[in-house]
Amino acid sequence: MRYRPVIGLEIHVQLSTKTKAFCSCPADVFELPPNTAICPVCTGQPGALPVPNEEMIRFAVKTALALNCKIHKYSRFDRKNYFYPDLPKGYQISQYFYPIATEGFLEIDGDEGKKKVRIRRLHLEEDAGKLVHEGDSITRASYSLVDMNRCGVPLIEIVTEPDISSPREARVFMEKLRSIVRYLGVSTGDMEKGALRCDANISVVDTETGRQSNRVEVKNMNSFRFVEKALEYEFERIVKAMERGEDVERETRGWDMTTKTTVSMRGKEEESDYRYFPEPDIPPVVLSDEYLEEVKKELPELPDEKAKRFMREYDLPEYDAKVLTSSKELAEFFEECVKVVNRPKDLSNWIMTEVLRELNERNIEITESKLTPQHFADLFKLMDEGKISIKIAKEIFPEVFETGKMPSQIVEEKGLVQISDEKLIEELVKKAMEQNPKAVQDYKSGKKKAAGFFVGYVMRETKGKANPELTNRIIQKLLEGE
């Protein structure tokens, strides 16, 4: 490929602390009425002084450890100065000169195999407020409203090196990061609610000439799919400009979900534009070795470690293990099921197909469903005893999922118990053979597909309730024994 994208990400993770970064206002503000979770500190009233949230610092250290970062025992807060309607203080408290962590990495499944994406820095900062645009899209809004509730909500910003080589890799990185912060319990990672936000910097290299375009920042990507789509669009836009012999402007662009394009928002700021200087009202953060060891002990088994254990303990393929461990709750559900039904691969197949389909259709997590390990124990027992076929099991599963009823109850209510009476099935097959000697002759002359006729006959006569495995066995025995 002649043109190659070079992508770096700046990710904001909203921390699930009880209170905001520097005041006692609640941090969970998503569903609150506008401007109801504010105080003099988070709205920048004169004389109000910030007090750092210790839980915020602990969450940042946990995340840094999970991302293989170097933790700095000494870090400091700084003021990032800029004007925007949703920033009442006129500056944002962040960490610029001395971040809490640097030099980490996250391994992802890249386009050409396993790939380490380096993390340049991880630092703490407070969130700004939120602009609500009144109109059908950001470009056609007639006016905007400001909600200050989000001001002061604690964030960690994670900045990667430009190691990402495609829009798909950017999406994969984001998905894996969300999985990690959820495992840690430091964030919900919900992009639609703004708990995980991604800005991407993209430039394009012409591999034939070595020429590289200006860097463009892309914002407003509030789903993993939009991260990929926005970067695909921007890559194509930059390539077209380069093919015309032009260069794109160094600017910030926003993804417009309605038009499926990026639109210019403003010129790209340089770091000097923010006039960073040390925050005079907050002392430095000093971490002891004992504190770091204490936090390290709190780390749970993370997705990669859990996937390796699933492969080792349950003899699962790598793909299955990664899908099952992508969500902490799904992994826990799988292990609870294995305790009840010790058939890991069969359970994995059901969870990865039937369960995930039902969850995705409803856009819910496994913890929000009525499904329990006992449902699988009951379902597998019905199949093992020959009472239902796998086809019937899959047909009743949506109802099991929706209602929480036991499979055996649904089977009984609907009269779905399959017929496993060997004598009855044998009589039906013999009857079919007597009535259709040509199909018998076809089978004997090598046309094995002719057996399907007899299967169909038995299923029609039993209204689909005949045990298919037993039926096939009897058909084969009678046809080959003639």
UniProtKB/Swiss-Prot annotation:
List keywords of the entry alphabetically. ATP-binding, Ligase, Nucleotide-binding, Protein biosynthesis
Q: According to its UniProt record, which reaction does this protein catalyse?
A: L-glutamyl-tRNA(Gln) + L-glutamine + ATP + H2O = L-glutaminyl-tRNA(Gln) + L-glutamate + ADP + phosphate + H(+); L-aspartyl-tRNA(Asn) + L-glutamine + ATP + H2O = L-asparaginyl-tRNA(Asn) + L-glutamate + ADP + phosphate + 2 H(+)
Q: Name one GO molecular function term.
A: asparaginyl-tRNA synthase (glutamine-hydrolyzing) activity
Q: Which domain of life is it from?
A: Bacteria
Question: HAMAP family recorded for this chain?
Answer: GatB (MF_00121)
Quaternary structure note: Heterotrimer of A, B and C subunits.
Give the similarity note: Belongs to the GatB/GatE family. GatB subfamily.
Protein name, UniProt field: Aspartyl/glutamyl-tRNA(Asn/Gln) amidotransferase subunit B
User: What is the species of this protein?
Assistant: Thermotoga sp. (strain RQ2)
Upper taxonomic lineage? Bacteria, Thermotogati, Thermotogota, Thermotogae, Thermotogales
Report which gene this protein is encoded by: gatB
